[in-house]
């Protein structure tokens, strides 16, 4: 079977369009996004345990258009090592290892409103912008002084932001 010049032209057009769409850069999933709650700081809580896995996730997120990420490790009585200075040191070391990834990384924290919270607040809170603080409570039972703690957070110049509101 011989193709006419018009059929050849149409075939070439269809194939070139198909191939260019097949190999074209896909649309970004989250262009310009800021993620305000992650557990990407390796080895400090229930997030990634290895730096390799954290770096792989950051590379994936970069490829999807994410531009800024707040690393928000848990700070709670059950994780005594997770103090502000310790987390800052871990973050700075990790950020140096992320130099090849073009995402603006920041450190904040996810604070459990437990018996150690007031002590943590006296040390200074790791917040998003000097104003917003990520907090959580047990999904089994809120502390009896929940409203007092939320009020005290505000008296200290912060706006509490609940992590996982769907749990409550």
Q: Residue spans of the language-model regions?
A:
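Extended substrate/RNA-proximal surfaces in nucleic-acid metabolism proteins
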Residues: 82-168
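An N-terminally biased module of ancient metal coordination in phosphate/nucleic-acid-related enzymes
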Residues: 9-102
